[in-house]
């Protein structure tokens, strides 16, 4: 993902003392979860951008990026301490595993055998179940100020999944304000693995300002519709003539209240778009722009689809 604004990016120094540019106190992230140490790790570049990550759940906690005036703004949702991440179940900024999104009815067939998993969302297994990797402590290694490698070992039978898996997530902040996230997983036997990042972006940089005016573009002619339990129906529908057509920039809120069955099923947008950019990293799969701040986010991926979720179940009672 690349973040930027239509402005000259000023050079900025590092955070003073033991606090990040976003105001995070590193001491509030120094703890233990299930006997494993947690911490806050900071990535910086010469352009003044800062990304803070905790190894609890491999989560992006804050992203400071300059707006059109050069003012640094935090554009992701996150808590300011490890205790809230542990106490309040959420996927804020998390590295999701062992399997992102839903496995229908908590079961799948592998090599002729039916594997059964815990269900935690409308009768399905969502994001690896109730004890997904977003609640685990990763081993952290920071070789330089611009990168962080996180490693997790998941034993055979973990949350019902077959095979022992070693997963590695590498975050890298580039000099042109891109956050590069690379995933790698190895298993000792056939299994399923599907990894992603679950950050919530508000490019206005103002948590009181809704995202509905953000302009979204998705390079996709089709999407996969879902039933009322958010499970895909096994087909690809055209976005043409529907609220799911973001082939040209459109405000997220422009049609979100339309009388549309798919919007009702998803309680808003919580769908997978079938990308026209599949396998092509030379052009963005999606682009989001805040008219308030001028900050733009471009997403590049070599995957065939992109899931867009606009926080339909965030009711404002949890603040990050």
Please report, for each region that a protein language model flagged, where it lies by residue:
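An exposed, glycine/acidic-rich loop-and-rim segment of catalytic or binding clefts
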Residues: 12-51, 55-320
């Amino acid at each position: 993902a690349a973040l930027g604004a239509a402005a000259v990016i000023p050079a900025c120094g590092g955070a003073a003392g033991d606090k990040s540019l976003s105001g995070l106190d590193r001491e509030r992230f120094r703890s233990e979860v299930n006997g494993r140490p947690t911490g806050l790790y900071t990535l910086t570049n010469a352009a003044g951008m800062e990304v803070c990550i905790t190894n609890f759940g491999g989560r992006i906690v804050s992203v400071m990026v300059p707006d059109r005036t050069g003012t640094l703004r935090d554009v992701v949702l996150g808590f300011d301490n490890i205790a809230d991440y542990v106490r309040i179940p959420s996927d804020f900024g998390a590295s999701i595993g062992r399997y992102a999104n839903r496995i229908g009815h908590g079961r799948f067939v592998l090599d002729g055998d039916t594997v059964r998993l815990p269900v935690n969302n409308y009768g399905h297994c969502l994001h690896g179940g109730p004890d997904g990797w977003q609640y685990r402590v990763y081993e952290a290694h920071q070789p330089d100020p611009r990168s962080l490698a996180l490693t997790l070992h998941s034993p055979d039978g973990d949350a019902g999944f077959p095979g022992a898996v070693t997963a590695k997530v590498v975050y890298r902040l580039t000099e042109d304000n891109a956050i590069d996230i690379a995933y790698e997983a190895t298993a000792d036997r056939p299994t399923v693995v599907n990894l992603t990042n679950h950050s919530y972006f508000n490019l206005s940089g103002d948590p009181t300002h809704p995202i509905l005016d953000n302009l979204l573009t998705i390079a996709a002619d089709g999407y996969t519709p879902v039933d009322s339990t958010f499970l895909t129906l096994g087909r690809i529908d055209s976005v043409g003539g529907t609220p799911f057509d973001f082939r040209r920039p459109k405000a997220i809120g422009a049609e979100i209240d339309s009388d549309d069955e798919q919007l009702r099923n998803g309680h808003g947008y919580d769908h997978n778009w079938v990308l026209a950019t599949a396998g092509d990293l030379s052009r963005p799969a999606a682009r989001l722009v805040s008219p308030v701040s001028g900050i733009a986010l471009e997403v590049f991926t070599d995957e065939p689809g992109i899931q867009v979720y606009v926080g339909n179940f965030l009711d404002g009672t949890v603040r990050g």
